């Protein structure tokens, strides 16, 4: 009885009944719903045409139909050699049914599988987090200058090396045929041995030189302003409205905890990241700068120093919030994929085709690999907490991950050293800005406000004179700013938080192109752009490498121009154009002429570093 009901619900069986009925009236004797049910593999066995007395008349019709189906099956067996391929396809569809939702999911996994394995070795997975790494390493100046000076400095070493080589030479038996010149050359520097020296003394001399210049400048200012430093414009800029600035900065920081709240809701199961969480975080990020920017630029009458500080710090907070949100959002997607694929494998293991099993198994393997990429003790989603986000915000890094390399303890002497470096560098920056930069800036503003009546030739000459006057002071200020932020400040924060990776910058002063400079002069920002802009645009927007590179530079140029707007409250576009001009400089440095002359390339690069920022500042102040 049950088997008969199953046959009456089988669409293919009813089709066979219609086609094999001898009488036209019987071809439509059985009625059934038009709803297409999922096909299942049903074994049809011949049944007796004898009708049971207890069954209704429809059972007799069913028995006749079963016999007809059996006869049709026998015919199919005889034709197996002719249409065997079609029959195998039909049997495969019956044996391994795939619903449309599952088919869409498998297609999605197939498209993603290309980016999840190495191109040369398909057995190795590629993690989304493999583009950025953190390792215990010191900062460049510490490893090359500070640490050797404090631990191994013992005065001049070159003379001692020469004396040692001469003593070694005297102990050897000289060849009779050796000339005096050959002997002298061998004594000075024997083959295979290199004379070594260090420049620790020059490092000390440079800072001493800067200190005496600052001291002399302060004395001159003290005498010329009748014994007071309170009237210094730079001091007033940096010390006004400190309490209001601190409260506003704290409000910006606390507002970024919104991303933690969103992931907390996802963790509790109230919302899903894929739609609700993603949209909520994206809207928050899109509104963060447009809402806060007018507050500290227009509502409060802050100085340009305060405006640029709040803007840059708000951008840092935005990057940290974005990295935290989308790192965990990606792991939510991976976790959901693992659960879905493993459930399908366990539930429909016997009815899935080998190809489907392979796709789902690879999906599970990759998800486990991704979740355990940083540590086998998977902490996700336990890392979603206010304390974890707070510690991430304290670390001198912009790319979030669950674990970072840490030091065993805090070296308080090192903290004091870096704190003194911060204070001393800020003092030098204030003196440089007040003595060397402020007078030139005032003349540039006067040039901007005064119309030129003598023609464009005198105007160009005066502008060039202002530029040449701007270059020395601004170059010194540029170097001091770099040292204060990327070496002194970040190392001090890293030591206080026991953050072990101190690679905040590379040896950018040895660059031979601006392409190298953009990668290594600001490593934290480069890592953020690499993961969350460059690679994310290739994955989400399907950009090519060239398109992703152009998009990254355009986004960076836009934020640089907004920074200039925070200072001058006007859109000029000079810095935006100079940022894009790096493509031309890169193309120039990649020419055969400069590639074969790295020394000349470094000279061209250094010339650009010295003149470029000064030219940009002069343009904004004068035009």
From Swiss-Prot:
GO terms for cellular component: endoplasmic reticulum membrane. It is found in: Endoplasmic reticulum membrane. It is an enzyme of class 2 (transferase). The chain crosses the membrane at residues 195-215, 242-262, 277-297, 384-404, 422-442, 548-568, 603-623. GO terms for biological process: ergosterol metabolic process. Residues 57-72 have a biased composition (Low complexity). The active site is at residue 560. Keywords: Acyltransferase, Endoplasmic reticulum, Membrane, Transferase, Transmembrane, Transmembrane helix. GO terms for molecular function: ergosterol O-acyltransferase activity. A motif (FYXDWWN motif) lies at residues 504-510. It holds the Pfam family MBOAT. Sterol O-acyltransferase that catalyzes the formation of stery esters. Belongs to the membrane-bound acyltransferase family. Sterol o-acyltransferase subfamily. This is Sterol O-acyltransferase 1. It comes from Saccharomyces uvarum (strain ATCC 76518 / CBS 7001 / CLIB 283 / NBRC 10550 / MCYC 623 / NCYC 2669 / NRRL Y-11845) (Yeast).
């Amino acid at each position: 009885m049950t088997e008969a009901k199953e046959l009456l619900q089988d669409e293919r069986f009813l089709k066979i009944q219609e086609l094999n009925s001898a009488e036209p009236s019987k071809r439509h004797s059985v009625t059934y719903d038009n709803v297409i049910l999922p096909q299942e593999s049903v074994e049809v066995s011949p049944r007796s045409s004898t009708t049971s007395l207890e069954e209704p008349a429809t059972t007799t019709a069913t028995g006749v139909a079963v016999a007809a189906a059996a006869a049709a099956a026998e015919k199919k067996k005889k034709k197996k050699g002719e249409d065997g391929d079609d029959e195998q396809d039909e049997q495969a569809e019956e044996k391994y049914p795939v619903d449309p939702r599952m088919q869409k999911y498998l297609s999605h996994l197939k498209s993603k599988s290309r980016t999840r394995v190495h191109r040369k070795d398909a057995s190795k997975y590629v993690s989304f987090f493999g583009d950025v790494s953190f390792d215990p390493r010191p900062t460049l100046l510490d490893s090359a200058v500070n640490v050797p000076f404090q631990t191994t400095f013992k005065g001049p070493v070159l003379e001692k090396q020469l004396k040692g080589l001469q003593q070694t030479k005297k102990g050897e038996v000289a060849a009779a045929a050796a000339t005096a010149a050959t002997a002298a050359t061998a004594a000075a520097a024997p083959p295979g041995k290199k004379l070594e020296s260090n420049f620790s003394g020059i490092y000390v001399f440079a800072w001493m030189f800067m200190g005496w210049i600052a001291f002399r400048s302060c004395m001159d200012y003290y005498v010329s302003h009748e014994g007071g430093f309170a009237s210094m414009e730079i001091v007033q800029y940096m010390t006004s409205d400190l309490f209001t600035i601190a409260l506003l900065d704290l409000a910006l920081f606390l507002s970024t905890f919104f991303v933690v709240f969103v992931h907390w809701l996802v963790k509790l199961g109230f919302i899903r990241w894929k739609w609700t969480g993603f949209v909520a975080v994206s809207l928050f990020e899109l509104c963060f700068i447009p809402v806060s920017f007018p507050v500290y630029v227009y509502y409060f009458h802050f100085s340009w120093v305060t405006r640029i500080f709040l803007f840059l710090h708000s951008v840092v907070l935005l990057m940290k919030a974005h990295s935290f949100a989308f790192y965990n959002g990606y792991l939510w997607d991976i976790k959901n994929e693992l659960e879905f694929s493993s459930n399908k494998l366990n539930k429909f293991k016997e009815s899935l085709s080998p190809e489907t099993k392979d796709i789902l198994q690879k999906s599970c393997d990759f998800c486990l690999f991704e979740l355990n990429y940083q540590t086998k003790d998977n902490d996700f989603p336990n890392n979603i907490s206010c304390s974890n986000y707070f510690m991430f915000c304290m670390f001198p890094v912009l790319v979030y991950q669950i674990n970072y390399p840490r030091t065993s303890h805090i070296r308080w002497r090192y903290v004091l050293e870096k704190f003194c470096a911060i204070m001393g560098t800020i003092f030098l920056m204030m003196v440089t800005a007040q003595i060397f930069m402020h007078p030139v800036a005032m003349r540039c503003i006067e040039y901007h406000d005064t119309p030129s009546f003598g023609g464009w030739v005198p105007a160009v000459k005066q502008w060039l004179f202002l530029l040449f006057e701007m270059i020395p002071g601004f170059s010194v200020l540029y170097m001091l700013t770099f040292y204060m932020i990327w070496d002194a400040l970040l190392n001090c924060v890293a030591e206080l938080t026991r953050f072990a990776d101190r690679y905040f910058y590379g040896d950018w002063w040895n660059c031979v192109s601006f392409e190298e400079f953009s990668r290594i002069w600001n490593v934290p920002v480069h890592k953020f752009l690499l993961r969350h802009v460059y690679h994310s645009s290739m994955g989400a927007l399907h950009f090519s490498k060239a398109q992703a590179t152009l998009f990254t530079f355009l986004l960076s140029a836009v934020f640089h121009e907004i920074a200039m707007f925070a200072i001058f409250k006007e859109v000029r576009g000079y810095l935006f154009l100079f940022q894009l001009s790096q493509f031309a400089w890169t193309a120039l440095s990649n020419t055969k002429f400069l590639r074969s002359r790295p020394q000349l390339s470094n000279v061209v690069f250094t010339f650009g570093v010295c003149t470029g920022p000064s030219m940009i500042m002069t343009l904004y102040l004068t035009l």
